[in-house]
Amino acid sequence: MATDVAEPVVPDCRGDIRSGARSDADYPLRVLYCGVCSLPTEYCEYMPDVTKCRQWLEKNFPDEFAKLTVENSPKQEAGVGEGQGTAGEEEEKKKQKRGGRGQIKQKKKTVPQKVTIAKIPRAKKKYVTRVCGLATFEIDLKEAQRFFAQKFSCGASVTGEDEIIIQGDFTDDIIDVIQEKWPEVDDDSIEDLGEVKK
């Protein structure tokens, strides 16, 4: 009793619809990677430096650049073309590092580097010393507060954005202590305001 069993036809992987393979492409595929962002050139439009990627592609592979610009919708081209003058200038100012950080934050505006020291009266014959401006020298205020509290054996606290309050009258000693601990703060940039009201 022999029966004929038909063997199942196995489709070629090359044209298999389920695998997502394209029948018009030669395998293995050759993918062109961008020299700026190191992604395939089709994905450059999703990076923050689109104009740099486009310039690199236009310079090194003009035929691929022509294909990509023809495939782009008019909406995308208009969006890139409008801000190209200002975007080019901004590109010069910003520098992107690898790792996909995106736009780099602008640095804070530079303020004059000046440390002011003031003696403020409290109840009866008690005083507090206020030190302002250490943050302009990029000194950590928490570290400075701990240092002052340990050095003068008293309470010290960071009260404002750039203000340290030390319990006690240390206006005479604090100038020398600041210059000794942080040499970047020179004598000309320290100003003693004397006794001021709170």
UniProtKB/Swiss-Prot annotation:
Task of the protein: May be involved in the translation of target mRNAs by scanning and recognition of the initiation codon. Involved in translation initiation; promotes recruitment of aminoacetyled initiator tRNA to P site of 40S ribosomes. Can promote release of deacylated tRNA and mRNA from recycled 40S subunits following ABCE1-mediated dissociation of post-termination ribosomal complexes into subunits.
Single annotated GO MF: translation initiation factor activity
Family per record: Belongs to the DENR family.
UniProt record, GO biological process: formation of translation preinitiation complex; translation reinitiation
CDD domains xrefs: DENR_C
Recorded superkingdom: Eukaryota
Record's keyword terms, sorted: Initiation factor, Protein biosynthesis
Matches recorded under Pfam families: DENR_N, SUI1
Keyword Plastid appears in the UniProt entry: no
Region named Disordered: 72-110
Name assigned to this protein: Density-regulated protein
Span of domain SUI1: 115-182
Compositionally biased residues, Basic residues: 95-110
